[in-house]
Amino acid sequence: MSMVYFNIFMAFTVSFVGLLMYRSHLMSSLLCLEGMMLSLFVMMSMTILNNHFTLANMAPIILLVFAACEAALGLSLLVMVSNTYGTDYVQNLNLLQC
């Protein structure tokens, strides 16, 4: 494994650990998810370019489309929760609470 792949894998790991540690606020969870998607995009693009996968050239673009949709939905959920409850705690998203 080259150093570049190792650094990208470490970026994914740090984002994942951040998602596990800072899951009380919705904004920090969304930022960690975006970091994970960015590292996946870079890893996928480099793998496709290095291995000359001509059939999979559109896969990073599709991943970016899904990441943009995820970010838009996450930000709209953040705005809705912060307007309703005044905070961005993830505990407010539990539908089973009264």
Swiss-Prot record:
InterPro entries, A to Z: NADH_UbQ_OxRdtase_chain4L/K, NUOK/Mnh_C1-like
Name of protein: NADH-ubiquinone oxidoreductase chain 4L
Membrane-spanning ranges: 1-21, 29-49, 61-81
Places the protein is found: Mitochondrion inner membrane
Top-level EC class as recorded in UniProt: translocase
GO CC terms of this entry: mitochondrial inner membrane; respiratory chain complex I
Enzyme Commission number(s) from the entry: 7.1.1.2
Assembly with partners or alone: Core subunit of respiratory chain NADH dehydrogenase (Complex I) which is composed of 45 different subunits.
Organism expressing this protein natively: Phocarctos hookeri (Hooker's sea lion)
